[in-house]
Amino acid sequence: IALKGTVSKPLLEALNALEFYNLPPPKSLGLEWVQNEVFSTIEAFDLDVKQILRTVVEHCAIQISTVLNSHHLQNGLITGGGVFNSFLMQRISALYGQEIPPTNSTLIEYKEALIFGFLGVLKLKNDPNCLQSVTGASRNHSSGSIYFPEKHRKRV
C-alpha cells in the first residue's frame, strides 16, 4: 500500500523533527510514545492512508539509515519484523548507500521468540526485563503481562 502512495513533505518534516531523535542513547521507542507523539503528529495532517504509509516508511528509512551512517558500519544484520517489509528495506538501502543483505527469516523469527521468551522468564521471576542502561528509562523495571490459559488462570 505504501508503495502506491506519495511522500507528504510537511508530515515527513514533522515526524523527523520529533525531539526523540535528538536525544542521546540509550533510548527506546515505547508503544506509549508512538501513540502519543507519532500518531498525534500524523493525525494533524489530512492525508489518505497510502500517503500516510508512504511517508511513515520514508521516515523510518531516514531514521534507520541516519543511525547506520553515523556508525560507519561495514556489515551487520537488520532483524525484527520490519525486515519483512521489502519496500522499507529498499528505502533503507537506498538512503544508507549500501545494499543490505537479506537476513534469513528463520534467524529473525528465532531471535524474536528467544528474546520475548527470555523477557517472559524475567517477568515470571519478577526480575527487571527493561534496563535503564539499554532503554533510557528512569529506572530498571519489569514490563509486560503474562496470561495463562483459563485452566491455569493467574495473571502476573
Model-identified regions with their sequence ranges:
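Conserved phosphate-binding/catalytic loops in two-lobed NTP-binding clefts
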Residues: S93-I115
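A short, acidic, amphipathic alpha-helical segment used as a generic capping/interface helix at domain edges
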Residues: A61-N69
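Acidic-glycine-rich active-site phosphate/pyrophosphate-binding loop
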Residues: W33-S40, S86-G97
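Glycine-rich phosphate-binding loops at beta-strand->alpha-helix junctions
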Residues: L73-I92
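Conserved ATP-utilizing enzyme core subdomain
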Residues: I1-A61, L73, K125-N126, T135-V156
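Short proline/glycine-enriched turn/loop segments at secondary-structure junctions
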Residues: T106, Q132-A137
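Membrane-interface transmembrane-helix boundary segments in multi-pass integral membrane proteins
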Residues: K50, G76, N104-T106
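A polyampholytic, Gly/Pro-enriched intrinsically disordered region
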Residues: F118-L131
